A protein has these predicted regions:
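C-terminal cap of metal-dependent C-N hydrolases
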Residues: 9, 321-324, 375-442
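A glycine-rich helix N-cap at a beta->alpha junction
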Residues: 110-126
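Metal-associated gating/positioning segment near the N- to mid-region
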Residues: 47-115
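Short catalytic-loop micro-motif centered on adjacent basic/acidic residues
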Residues: 90-91, 121-124, 231-236
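Histidine-rich, glycine-flanked metal-binding segment
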Residues: 1-54
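Divalent metal-coordination and catalytic microenvironments
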Residues: 9, 22, 27, 49, ...
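His/Asp/Glu-enriched, well-ordered alpha-helical/loop segment
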Residues: 199-229, 278, 299-306, 311-387
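Histidine/acidic residue-rich metal-binding segments in metalloenzymes
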Residues: 132-147, 153-306
């Protein structure tokens, strides 16, 4: 494993920005100093003032492996991820077959070990008949346990109150919840079909999967967690009203936490007019007021982490009528450049973005030696280059297997110039390094 010396960087770490050099050896950060001299590293990079940040740890991706090779795989999506500044990911269980057994979990780990250029971990799924397996899980073997309290891609809905009570009482590790109230969604869909017939527009999606459906389910999850003392992490909040369910306190003082996803921070319901089904996702992208409330909540401790919820589908699938078009969109390749638009617009400080995409994710999932720029930690690093004139997304190749992006019309004011994964050069000067090998994430619980 080659040694790497990064000079003249603007390091962003633990609420501070400072100028300095960073040395990597045997995959780990061995020295951080204002100036490092007398080292003969195999690779030397002059950052020329670029931001040097810990790589994004994405707590929610759907890489479609196994089961949907036309949409994605660990090979294709991990390469898109490192191009977008993501050095570690945690994959969701709604694959084909679903990750509902130890055998399926082992198979996913094997697949990722062969082909992923990013570090990897896996969430275990919940069904109506695998609670004994869930209760017996080793917390160090999984990133978390995922329950779909609302119907979504993969048909893994769990809404029986007795099963939910037992799950929240017995789950041995962090429980991640997709929260939408399916009966409300079904009733809303029936009303919209009465209005539009078979020609429901994509703009109706946030009316069908509306704020009330989200709040109803999120409230239920929080109530269950409080009753049973469950370590709960509610995924992809989309509404201002849900924010009141979560405490504005440091992560170390909470047992109930929340994630927001980048598309819910960057799009709102006005974008359905131009993007249609391309931004159809569950839960739905909602109003500008909701988007702005989510942005404000990131400035406090009410929202703990930012994920992508990368969920690719083929272009042809997305061209179907609304009812038949699947929910989800590809996001990892443009994750950090897109989020850095919030920094460029003075919505978020760069230190807050780094905290919510790296520091807090490592803390929340008990991932040791990652997520920070610290001596002795794994060198999961990203150099961010300013692009004053903007970089047109349409002029860049799409690395995700699905071959499209909702950001096709955007120009980003920052780019990822270099990504190191566990000390290995994964992405540099718009080129992938296929010899990079991601490592399994460890969870110290």
């Amino acid at each position: 494993m080659s040694s790497v010396l990064i000079r003249n960087a603007r390091l962003v770490n633990e609420g501070r920005e400072f100028d300095g050099d960073l040395l990597v050896s045997h995959g780990r950060i061995v020295k951080i100093a204002s100036s490092i001299e007398g080292e003969n590293a195999a690779i030397e990079i002059d950052a020329d003032g670029q931001w040097l940040v810990p790589g994004m740890i994405d707590d929610q991706v759907h890489f479609r492996d196994p089961g949907s090779p036309a949409k994605g795989s660990f090979y294709s999506e991990s390469r898109a991820a490192v191009a977008g500044g993501i050095t570690s990911f945690m994959d969701m269980p709604n694959t084909n077959p679903a990750t509902l057994s130890l055998a399926a979990l082992t198979d996913k780990k094997r697949r990722a070990a062969i082909s992923s250029v990013a570090n990897y971990g896996f969430h275990f799924g919940v069904s109506n008949d695998n609670l004994d397996i869930v209760a017996a899980l080793n917390p160090c073997e999984v990133a978390g346990v995922k329950v779909f309290m609302g119907a979504s891609t993969g048909n893994m809905l769990v809404d029986d109150p007795r099963i939910l009570e037992r799950l929240f009482a017995e789950v041995p590790t962090i429980l991640l919840a997709h929260c939408e109230h399916t009966p409300s969604i079904n009733a809303n869909a029936m009303n919209l079909r009465a209005l539009f017939g078979e020609h429901i527009p994509a703009s109706a999606h946030p009316l069908i999967r509306n704020a009330e459906a989200c709040l109803h389910s999120s409230s239920m999850a929080v109530d269950l967690a409080k009753r049973h003392g469950t370590r709960l992490h509610v995924l992809h909040l989309t509404t201002a009203r849900e924010l009141a369910l979560f405490e504005d306190r440091p992560l170390s003082q909470k047992h109930i936490t929340a994630e927001v996803c980048l598309h819910h921070l960057l799009f709102d319901d006005r974008d359905y007019a131009s993007l249609g089904n391309l931004i159809k996702c569950n839960p739905a992208i909602k109003t500008q007021a909701d988007r702005d409330a989510l942005r404000r909540a990131l400035l406090s401790d009410r929202l703990d982490v930012i994920g992508s919820d990368h969920a690719p589908h083929t272009w042809d699938e997305k061209q179907r009528p609304y009812d038949l078009a699947p929910s989800g969109l590809p996001l990892v390749q443009h994750a950090l450049p897109a989020l850095l638009e919030l920094v460029a617009d003075d919505v978020l400080p760069i230190t807050t973005l780094v905290a919510k995409t790296s520091h807090r994710v490592a803390d929340l999932f008990a991932i040791p030696d990652r997520g920070y720029l610290r001596e002795g930690y794994w060198a999961d690093l990203v150099l961010i280059k300013p692009e004053p004139g903007g970089v047109a997304v349409s002029q860049q190749p799409i690395l995700s297997q699905c071959g499209w992006t909702p950001f096709a019309r955007w120009r980003f004011r920052h780019s990822v110039s270099t990504t190191l994964v566990s000390g290995q050069m994964a992405w540099h000067d718009q080129r992938l390094n296929d010899s990079c090998q991601g490592l399994p994430l460890r969870f110290m619980r």
